[in-house]
Amino acid sequence: MKKLTLKKSERIRKRRSYLQIYQHGKRSFTKHFTIVVSENDLDFPRLGMTVTKKIGNAVKRNRIKRLIREFFRLNKDRFKASQDIVIIAKGNTSSMKYADVCRELGVLLTKEPQNITQE
């Protein structure tokens, strides 16, 4: 049986890593998220998130982060193995349901990063 965990090594944690991804990655936009994808030298995908104070208070920001992490945790085997993915939440995401987050981020799994422009 496959483990559906999100290990510490599968997260992007260092500021230096975020800056490198922002500088060299390909940006894609959906209605509620901006996605930056960059190649890495590892054998597994890594997730990073940015949720600013424009989203709302800490409760709302943490809720969005939990939803994004859950989507990634359940779908990480469908991402390319050597990718760093940073998901930036836009200001109107705080009231989204998990199904809406899955539907919108599911676009990542079916299209190339430069082609994702769903508004």
UniProtKB/Swiss-Prot annotation:
Keywords: Endonuclease, Hydrolase, Nuclease, RNA-binding, tRNA processing. One of its GO terms (molecular function) is ribonuclease P activity. It is an enzyme of class 3 (hydrolase). It catalyses: Endonucleolytic cleavage of RNA, removing 5'-extranucleotides from tRNA precursor. PROSITE patterns: RIBONUCLEASE_P. GO terms for biological process: tRNA 5'-leader removal. The keyword GTP-binding does not apply. One of its GO terms (cellular component) is ribonuclease P complex. It holds the Pfam family Ribonuclease_P. InterPro entries: Ribosomal_Su5_D2-typ_SF, Ribsml_uS5_D2-typ_fold_subgr, RNase_P, RNase_P_CS. The keyword Cell membrane does not apply. Its EC number is 3.1.26.5. Consists of a catalytic RNA component (M1 or rnpB) and a protein subunit. HAMAP family: RNase_P. Belongs to the RnpA family. RNaseP catalyzes the removal of the 5'-leader sequence from pre-tRNA to produce the mature 5'-terminus. It can also cleave other RNA substrates such as 4.5S RNA. The protein component plays an auxiliary but essential role in vivo by binding to the 5'-leader sequence and broadening the substrate specificity of the ribozyme. This is Ribonuclease P protein component. The lineage of its organism: Bacteria, Pseudomonadati, Thermodesulfobacteriota, Syntrophia, Syntrophales.
